[in-house]
């Protein structure tokens, strides 16, 4: 799986990230798994056409010492579909920028 990983989180960093993600995206559905909706303006043509699969998401996996973001755009509505695919360059950059901005907002240094 292609991922953006930030490791060696301190306990206080983990707590701040968990609180922020819980507040912004709802509590983790499974142990540390957060579903981050992909901005509609960066969906690929195929993803935009698949209204029955919306919203599309990135997965963030937060555990005690690391945060991992999968570069797979997926749907909660289907397991297999043409719109489920690895992120485009703009989607990948959007996710990295989102995470980097969260770290900046929370003043977490890595």
Show the residue positions of the predicted features.
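Terminal, regulation- and interaction-focused segments at domain boundaries
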Residues: 1-17
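Long, compositionally biased, intrinsically disordered segments
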Residues: 2-5, 29-33, 91, 101
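Residues in well-ordered beta-strands of folded domains
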Residues: 7, 35-37, 61, 70
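Short, charged/polar surface micro-motifs in flexible loops or helix N-caps
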Residues: 11-12, 40-43, 64-67
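Short, surface-exposed beta-strand/loop "edge" segments at domain boundaries and coil↔beta transitions
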Residues: 12-15, 43-45, 76-80
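Short, intrinsically disordered, mixed-charge
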Residues: 19-27, 101-108
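Ser/Thr-rich, low-complexity intrinsically disordered terminal regions
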Residues: 22-55
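C-terminal basic regulatory modules in eukaryotic proteins
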Residues: 54-110
